[in-house]
């Protein structure tokens, strides 16, 4: 039994904002919390500020990004290195 491919998910409010900006033909930053939305060809050339849990990170959408999710381009975790702790223990010896 063959399966039908589903359409990519895009939040309705984000799609409406993209269409409105495309009609105006102005470049403005679009703010969104929808990290699960897929990137469509209509979004190419726009700057979208994507929420990472703390703040909005502006990302410029290019052609190779089409088909991927918005959340893939904004990291949510910050890695802290333990190098300074290791250097302190070596100096005490």
Curated annotation (Swiss-Prot):
It is found in: Plastid, Chloroplast. The keyword rRNA-binding applies. Gene3D superfamilies: 30s Ribosomal Protein S19, Chain A (3.30.860.10). The keyword RNA-binding applies. Disulfide bonds: none annotated. One of its GO terms (cellular component) is plastid. Keywords: Chloroplast, Plastid, Ribonucleoprotein, Ribosomal protein, RNA-binding, rRNA-binding. Belongs to the universal ribosomal protein uS19 family. Protein S19 forms a complex with S13 that binds strongly to the 16S ribosomal RNA. PANTHER family: RIBOSOMAL PROTEIN S19P FAMILY MEMBER, SMALL RIBOSOMAL SUBUNIT PROTEIN US19M. This is Small ribosomal subunit protein uS19c. The lineage of its organism: Eukaryota, Viridiplantae, Streptophyta, Embryophyta, Tracheophyta. The gene is rps19-A.
